[in-house]
From Swiss-Prot:
This is Geranylgeranyl pyrophosphate synthase. GO terms for cellular component: cytoplasm. GO terms for molecular function: metal ion binding; prenyltransferase activity. Mg(2+) 2 binds at D92, D98. Catalyzes the sequential condensation of three molecules of isopentenyl diphosphate (IPP) onto dimethylallyl diphosphate (DMAPP) to yield geranylgeranyl diphosphate (GGPP). Thereby, is a key enzyme for the biosynthesis of terpenenoids. It is an enzyme of class 2 (transferase). Mg(2+) 1 binds at D92, D98. Changing V161M: Produces similar amounts of FPP and GGPP. It comes from Picosynechococcus sp. (strain ATCC 27264 / PCC 7002 / PR-6) (Agmenellum quadruplicatum). It comes from the Bacteria. Its EC number is 2.5.1.29, 2.5.1.1, 2.5.1.10.
């Protein structure tokens, strides 16, 4: 993994990720206390606290702090983003969707609690995420409202759900164009990654032009993230991924490597990340975490 290059000299991404992940894990654990009915809270916590990179909340915190905000201002939203991401994983793993048995190295939610409880756990995490953002202390209400609107767009038919629908409709087809693939992933994966970054900026009180700049950064890393995901589905093992490998090929899904080959896919991901990093140059060293996170996305192994 690249932890520093010409863009981030002297900045240790490994140390930053470890510190931020520890903070996020503690906040997530405190965000969701088990009460009645016990089963649903246990199911929610099972997937929410199952580990993972915590990339989305960390992006939110990094963007907020880069623009002069504090971690406290963004923490509720950071946790909410992970709740929404976890919901999408629970539902994505269901037999009606991707039908997966393994997630983050553990049995998927429906394998432990059954399909009915898994669906409800995802629903509950989604609704609680919006409540949790709304309960953020010491942040102006108009900023929270902007974040809630963007979250709704990112997770609904304009975003994640819309991308998933086109993904399902494209399964088994051999004539899927790269434009369709881009639509799927800018909505299914990229929309939530984008709001991670823009929400952090908004919470810090960013100007509209700063939010727009960070939106472009996030769009680039979001697409790069998915290209790398497609490559890893072919090249990595289930142990490395923490989930079943080769699922795209098995489901006859069109991927970037199937259209471009692995070498061109890697080059495209590198290009997108370079553009993302270049867009942050006005922020100097304050942007080191976001620059290094972009590098991490294209160099990760899972």
């Amino acid at each position: 993994m690249v932890v520093a290059d010409a863009h981030t000299q002297g900045f240790s991404l490994a140390q930053y990720l470890q510190e931020q992940k520890t903070i996020v894990e503690t906040a997530l654990d405190q965000s969701l206390v088990i009460t009645e009915p016990v089963t649903i809270y246990e199911a929610m916590r099972y997937s929410l606290l199952a580990g993972g990179k915590r990339l989305r909340p960390i992006l939110c915190l990094a963007a907020c702090e880069m623009l002069g905000g504090t971690a406290a201002m963004a923490m509720n939203t950071a946790c909410a983003l992970e709740m929404i991401h976890t919901m999408s994983l629970i539902h994505d793993d269901l037999p009606a969707m991707d039908n997966d048995d393994l997630r983050r190295g553990k049995p998927t939610n429906h394998k432990v609690y059954g399909e009915d409880i898994a669906i409800l756990a995802g629903d509950a995490l989604l609704s609680y995420a919006f409540e949790y953002v709304a309960r953020t202390p010491d942040v102006p209400a108009e900023r929270l409202l902007q974040v809630i609107v963007r979250l709704g767009q990112a997770v609904g038919a304009e975003g994640l759900v819309g991308g998933q629908v086109v993904d399902l409709e494209s399964e088994g087809k051999t004539d899927v164009a790269v434009e369709t693939l881009n639509f799927i992933h800018t909505h299914k994966t990229g929309a939530l990654l984008e709001v991670c970054v823009t929400a952090g900026a908004i919470l810090a009180g960013a100007k509209p032009e700063e939010v727009q700049l960070l939106s472009r950064y996030a769009q680039n890393i979001g697409l790069a993230f998915q290209i790398v995901d497609d490559i890893l589905d072919i090249t990595a093992t289930a142990e490395e991924l923490g989930k079943t490998a080769g699922k795209d090929l098995e489901a006859q899904k069109v991927t970037y490597p199937s259209l471009w080959g692995i070498e061109k896919s890697q080059a495209e991901a590198q290009k997108l990340v370079a553009e993302a990093i270049a867009s942050l140059e006005p922020y100097g060293e304050k942007a080191n975490p976001l620059k290094a996170l972009a590098e991490y996305i294209v160099n990760r192994k899972n």
